[in-house]
């Protein structure tokens, strides 16, 4: 699927699925993703539910050149500074767990530190909040965090609410308004398993897909990557 970017995830476990990868050569997995053509790598560093570690991200940073998203649920400013220190290029801000003031100030802080933020939404209200806080990268999670059910059409339905460029008025006081409008990046997350899923999302104007478990469970990640891209 030419024209859609892949954010590939390195994760050992998750709250909904438990242990995903008992054998976890995370640096090798990250290098495999990069070699396959991933645009970015998502890394879970949260120790309890995702069995992650800051060390994972630091070690991967030393071995790959593509951007790293720290996929932990950001809940305070400290975590944003920490993400910068360990080598992340982007942090995750989830609308469901942050209020509007937090979303806007955390986004500004990330930008000030030279990082991006993936602002995650799950429904219409959250998408509107993500746009209002000045998000330049909006991710729609196809998994309902309350019930864990997955519906890929969630991304398809919500795409129509997303403007093609980031509204300049919301850029925040510390960030200068760019003279050229910044393109909005729309990401679909969770439950993406087949080329058909990707074709459907691509046809609907999705810029990137974030794929975790599907890749983590695959014995040949490079082959799967090629299949999903339709190569």
Label every PLM stretch briefly.
Residues 4-5, 10, 17-118, 124-129, ...:
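N-terminal active-site wall of soluble small-molecule enzyme domains
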Residues 82-102, 139-148, 206-225:
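Glycine-rich phosphate-binding active-site loops on the catalytic face of alpha/beta enzymes
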Residues 149-150, 156, 185-201:
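Active-site-adjacent loop and "lid" segments of alpha/beta metabolic enzymes
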Residues 75-86, 122-133, 192-211:
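Catalytic cores of alpha/beta
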Residues 27-39, 132-144, 204-207:
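Structural recognition of alpha->loop->beta junctions
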Residues 165-182:
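Intrinsic disorder/low-complexity segments
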Residues 157-165, 202, 215-231:
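C-terminal helical cap(s) of enzyme catalytic domains, especially alpha/beta-barrels
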């Amino acid at each position: 699927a030419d024209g859609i970017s892949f954010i590939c995830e390195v994760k050992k476990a998750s709250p909904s699925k438990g242990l995903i990868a008992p054998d976890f050569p995370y640096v090798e997995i990250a290098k495999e993703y990069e070699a396959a053509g991933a645009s970015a790598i998502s890394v879970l560093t949260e120790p309890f539910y995702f069995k992650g570690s800051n060390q994972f991200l630091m070690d991967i940073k030393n071995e790959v050149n593509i951007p790293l998203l720290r996929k932990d649920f950001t809940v305070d400013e400290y975590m944003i500074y920490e993400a910068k220190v360990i080598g992340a290029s982007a942090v995750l801000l989830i609308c469901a767990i942050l209020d509007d003031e937090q979303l806007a100030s955390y986004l500004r802080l990330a930008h000030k530190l030279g990082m991006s933020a993936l602002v995650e939404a799950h429904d219409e209200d959250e998408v509107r909040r993500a746009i209002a806080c000045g998000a330049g990268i909006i991710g729609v999670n196809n998994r309902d965090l309350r019930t864990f059910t997955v519906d890929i059409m969630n991304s398809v339905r919500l795409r129509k609410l997303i403007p093609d460029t980031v509204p300049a008025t919301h850029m925040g006081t510390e960030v200068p308004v760019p003279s050229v409008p910044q393109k909005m990046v729309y990401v679909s997350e969770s439950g993406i398993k087949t080329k058909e899923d990707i074709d459907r999302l691509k046809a609907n104007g999705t810029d990137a897909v974030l794929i975790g478990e599907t890749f983590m469970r695959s014995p040949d990640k490079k082959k799967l990557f090629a299949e999903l891209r339709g190569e």
